[in-house]
Amino acid sequence: MYSMNRVLIKIWGLLCVLLMANDASAQRVMPVIKIYGDFFDEYTEGKIIVCDPDSLYPDTFNMLAKYRGGTSKNYEKKNYAVKLVDEFGLKLSASILGMRDDNSWILDAMAVDKARMRNRVAFDIWNAMDVKPYYYEREPKVRTGISGKFVELYLNDDYNGIYCLNEKLDRKQLKLKKIKDDVVRGVLYKGFDWNGTCFGDEPEPYSNDSSVYQGFETVYPDVKDNGKTEWEPLIEKEDFVVNSSEDVYAAEYAEHFDVPMLMYLHILINTIGAIDNRGKNQFFYIYDITENKKMSFAPWDMDSSFGRDWRSWVYEDSYDKLWFENHIITQINDVDSTFLNNVANLYFKLRKTLLANDSIKSRFDEYFKLFEETGAAKREYARWNGTDDIELNFEEEKEFIHQFIDIRMAFLDGYYGDYSGVRNIPSEISDGIVYDIFGRRVYNPQPGQIYIMNGRCVYFRK
């Protein structure tokens, strides 16, 4: 394994303390992680050292690590997939920074996110919803979201910026049944592309020897670990959505899909304006296909949200469009007029608490405050501002996100209000006149601001 002198490790433990306190203006400290090795698209050996401000000594592990992601690999600031191993290269599990005991971790660079926190905040909201899948009574410890902690990362002694150390969403987190006596029970799929993942395409020939199918990848059973997987449960759902008559769909959709989970996801994805999560960047799973083939869902990779897309650009349609309208949902709407009424009632219940504007804003504000008070914001700016044509300004981005939340929630109040009877925003403003987000007429729109014109949100470019 990747070797490192024990004396150097002890020295690094002392340096951790210095690194976390080296900014005289810092009021707080963030955990520091240092990784050693040469990393590529495939796993290579390395070392990871974790310095927790609440611990006296650092934790040191052998690891295998590689670049993680699809398009994110094109950016200079890389994501890393990390697997902890022992001195013999065998799987090793450990709890890091108070999170779950596991061997597989993600170091999320958040390179396209000008706030460096969108995905984390989205998961914080989802976790606060505390949504339970249909098999919760059998698995009370099931979790459909992940925990994550912000850290400052050093790559081979060079500062590499703010990262979020995340858990993985996997069979273990979702408490799916393991293979037993060579019989597949729990299954877990992930949407990585738009091809097929919105359940609008006819089923195609498939092979259980392949890890991919129509934009899905199998997470469990994993072909690499088990030699095969099981695609049939997913194909059955695809066939049901595409080929069922309206009468059959109306009578049976609740047997096929976890409807309460769909309701919460409808609200989450629309609240954050996640433009890349209707099928892609979503998990699909069944607890035990030998007993019940009902499918449930969970979100993933929600960085294209809160007003920006996967390139970090302002995405105007994210302000006043719906973003969770895959074919499962649209066909439920077609055959069951009560579905959106129930979603709307749930939405307005959540609006009183964790989806109140100030509640959502405060989640961002706490992380922005953490970055500022630890000095991490300054270091991130110095290291990465302008790289890959992405300009950083945390104060401006905070205001941008606040503005998005006000506009987006006003739009959703109107949309869901049509189904619940709740009306607490004015009717559409039109006639080509420009208004600010508070409905006041604007005679001199300023570049870089968002306004309302003809009932739509418009971003005036610089």
Language-model segments: residues:
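Boundary at the C-terminal end of the N-terminal hydrophobic targeting segment
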Residues: 21-26
